[in-house]
Amino acid sequence: MSVLALQEYEFERQFNEDEAIRWMQENWKKSFLFSALYAACILGGRHVMKQREKFELRKPLVLWSLTLAAFSIFGAIRTGGYMVNILMTKGLKQSVCDQSFYNGPVSKFWAYAFVLSKAPELGDTLFIVLRKQKLIFLHWYHHITVLLYSWYSYKDMVAGGGWFMTMNYLVHAVMYSYYALRAAGFKISRKFAMFITLTQITQMVMGCVVNYLVYLWMQQGQECPSHVQNIVWSSLMYLSYFVLFCQFFFEAYITKRKSNAAKKSQ
């Protein structure tokens, strides 16, 4: 089946990707401003909340998580279908190197929606601050760096972006659905939380693999449009995520389990 045979919705067909890419090329540096404001809000919010009782915010959190879950599920279905078709009809190299993900049917809207969504997703942290929950380094570091890198990369339509975005849509579809269920009061097995973290770790490994393939094909003189600077920043980002998520997995599920087992045996 041809990629062009994928059914487009009217809003996808009407989307002007040239205008979107042009806007990002002119405005991508605003991601630094958003990141600075985000950091300031975290520091200011935590300072203010020291003197206040925590907010419950259960219903707003359910609505927030459901909205992001629905967006991610729809995005995963649309971009996933597109990438599978590219992979099946044109092969692995084309699925990694082809820039059509940014301007082709179906995916062009979801590529732009993805990078824009990284700004409002910063709102995740607002719930942590207002509910006076533990805010770990991984959380805010991940939010800031994903925002900066996605805006920086979209403007250049770099190779590998289709896989980066599709993987993130898939992981977020599961993650935000889990958050919504937890916020709604459903009891979810701890193993499911472990599964989500493992999918995140897998995503980081795959991100590094994609970066390696892009670099390899570039060095071989094949058409795989990116630049070394982008590959370096992307690889450092994915490697840092890999280390931090592995550390989180070990501390949250391995160390804590051993600690609980030791307490029960006393």
UniProtKB/Swiss-Prot annotation:
Among Pfam families, the record links this protein to: ELO
In terms of InterPro entries, this protein maps to: ELO_CS (IPR030457), ELO_fam (IPR002076), ELOVL6 (IPR033675)
GO CC, alphabetical: endoplasmic reticulum; endoplasmic reticulum membrane
**According to the UniProt entry, what is the EC number of this protein?**
2.3.1.199
- Describe activation and inhibition of this protein: The reaction is stimulated by the presence of HSD17B12, the enzyme catalyzing the second step of the elongation cycle.
> Part of which pathway?
Lipid metabolism; fatty acid biosynthesis
Protein's UniProt keywords contain rRNA processing: no
Q: Name one GO biological process term.
A: unsaturated fatty acid biosynthetic process
Q: Where are the transmembrane segments?
A: 32-49, 61-81, 109-129, 134-154, 157-177, 194-214, 231-251
Q: Which cysteines are joined by disulfide bonds?
A: none
**Post-translational modification, briefly?**
N-Glycosylated.
**Job of this protein:** Catalyzes the first and rate-limiting reaction of the four reactions that constitute the long-chain fatty acids elongation cycle. This endoplasmic reticulum-bound enzymatic process allows the addition of 2 carbons to the chain of long- and very long-chain fatty acids (VLCFAs) per cycle. Condensing enzyme that elongates fatty acids with 12, 14 and 16 carbons with higher activity toward C16:0 acyl-CoAs. Catalyzes the synthesis of unsaturated C16 long chain fatty acids and, to a lesser extent, C18:0 and those with low desaturation degree.
What name does this protein carry? Very long chain fatty acid elongase 6
What species does this protein belong to? Danio rerio (Zebrafish)
Primary gene name:
elovl6
